[in-house]
Curated annotation (Swiss-Prot):
Active site residues according to the UniProt entry: 25 (proton acceptor), 118 (charge relay)
Gene responsible for this protein: UGT76E12
The protein's name in its UniProt record: Flavonol 3-O-glucosyltransferase UGT76E12
Binding site for an anthocyanidin: 25, 379
Organism: Arabidopsis thaliana
UniProt GO MF annotations: flavonol 3-O-glucosyltransferase activity; flavonol 7-O-beta-glucosyltransferase activity; quercetin 3-O-glucosyltransferase activity; quercetin 7-O-glucosyltransferase activity
Family note: Belongs to the UDP-glycosyltransferase family.
Short name of any one Pfam family annotated for the protein: UDPGT
Length: 458
């Protein structure tokens, strides 16, 4: 929406960004950094020592990276779990970020226009307020997941939380006003109690003194959720400016990418390979991996499988897998520790993506017209999986325990059956809509222009 009656102020060219230290949050924040830099802003990124992102040569002129001290050992993430780690991180960083921001205000040659913080780094709001700087929330999840978090408190207050943790039948019930989401799809976590999750969500969706919210999504994907947030929940401007990976590329992988898989893909037929990657956090037990391997072998489809180091509990990588694992995967498969995902999804050989359905992976897959097998792990992934299957109709959700038969049937449905071909057609249509949205005159392009104008008038 255009802000009328305001004139842009000169010399407000610096923006401070505060990413959450996880791969799925760092990537879109750095894409936002590149996007705003292209619009004429100098960028200061304030990071924690935990999961520190080491900037490449892509981030040089007009980019500054500052690290704030915190005393969180690497082991805390595993020992505490993501939710308790989040609480501790926000508590640890509150004072150090305020001191850092105060120094930046004194040192910056360009006046700071605003502080943009990841919704999970909510400690940044108080410091921005104290330094008399406008602050803006950046949601790296879907608008629908953000909307779900925004009503969580109301559900909890009305004692509607029972279906979120009670019997299977109740969990299957549809959530009023959030069709087609079921209670079981709401973004809860297997890592913490419902009460702890409630506290996180109260903090992440509390706009406090925020001037606006920006979301890495597009109107063509989530128009109803965006309208709900804008008109009923937030009452401040909401800017859908994504998918950001289609606006500005930014190399941000915390793990080394094995690009040999591209050479392997070059030898495969069009739409003949299913790509399997469960993201940067999800874990799989050995028995689950064996069932997946067995199902893949039975499907007779070629596959590129990312098995992340440390993703198998009790094992560094696949060295502890039974001997039959290698026999099942070597014939038609290729396994890497980490892959250049955007390059993989854009490869003509890839016809499907088995994913945990993190929002970045979801956007990247839709952006390349690749349908998905959905195996959500936690949090907003379940929301995304439900939308992929029931709203956009380009996904097959695999629920419950994994066994060879379930895996084989899902892969064949996507890669062999007519159903999968229809999904590819719908995915291609969504891909074209997303590409149009980020081009001049498109909805995300216009929203980005309005957002840039907005922060120049603050």
């Amino acid at each position: 929406m255009q802000v009328l009656g305001m004139e842009e102020k000169p010399a407000r060219r610096s923006v401070v960004l505060v990413p959450f230290p996880a791969q799925g949050h760092i990537s879109p924040m750095m894409q936002l950094a590149k996007t705003l830099h292209l619009k004429g802003f100098s960028i200061t990124v304030v990071q924690t020592k935990f999961n520190y992102f080491s900037p490449s040569d892509d981030f040089t002129h007009d980019f500054q990276f500052v690290t704030i001290p915190e005393s969180l050992p690497e082991s805390d993430f595993k020992n505490l779990g993501p939710i308790q780690f989040l609480f501790k991180l926000n508590k640890e960083c509150k004072v150090s970020f305020k001191d850092c921001l105060g120094q930046l205000v004194l040192q910056q040659s360009n006046e700071i226009s605003c502080v943009i913080y990841d919704e999970f780094m909510y400690f940044a709001e108080a410091a921005a307020k104290e330094c008399k700087l406008p602050n803006i929330i950046f949601s790296t999840t879907s608008a629908t997941a953000f909307a779900c978090r925004s009503v969580f408190d109301k559900l909890y207050a009305n004692n509607v939380q029972a279906p979120l943790k009670e019997t299977k039948g109740q969990q299957e019930e549809l959530v009023p006003e959030f069709y087609p989401l079921r209670y079981k799809d709401f973004p809860v976590s297997r890592f913490a109690s419902l009460e702890s999750i409630m506290e996180v969500y109260r903090n992440t969706v509390d706009k406090r003194t925020a001037s606006s919210v920006i979301i890495n999504t597009a109107s063509c994907l989530e128009s109803s959720s965006l309208s709900f947030l804008q008109q009923q929940q937030l009452q401040i401007p909401v800017y859908p400016i994504g998918p950001l990976h289609m606006v500005a590329s930014a190399p941000t992988s915390l793990l080394e990418e094995n690009k040999s898989c591209i050479e392997w893909l070059n030898k495969q037929k069009v739409n003949s390979v299913i790509y399997i990657s469960m993201g940067s956090i999800a874990l799989m037990e050995i028995n689950e991996i064996m069932e997946v391997a067995s199902g893949l072998a039975a499907s007779n489809q070629h596959f590129l499988w990312v098995i992340r180091p440390g993703s198998i509990p009790g094992s560094e990588w696949i060295e502890s897998m039974p001997e039959e694992f290698s026999k099942m995967v070597l014939d038609r498969g290729y396994i890497v520790k980490w892959a250049p995902q955007k390059e993989v999804l854009s490869h003509p050989a890839v016809g499907g993506f088995w994913s945990h359905c993190g929002w970045n992976s979801t956007l990247e897959s839709i952006g390349q017209g690749v349908p998905m097998i959905c195996r959500p792990f936690s949090g907003d992934q379940k929301v995304n999986a439900r939308y992929l299957e029931c709203v956009w109709k380009i996904g097959i959700q695999v629920e419950g325990e994994l066994d060879r038969g379930v895996v084989e049937r899902a892969v064949k449905r996507l890669m062999v059956d007519e159903e999968g071909e229809e999904m590819r057609k719908r995915a291609f249509s969504l891909k074209e809509q997303l590409r149009a949205s980020v081009k001049s005159g498109g909805s995300s392009h216009n929203s980005l222009e309005e957002f840039v104008h907005f922060i120049r008038t603050l």
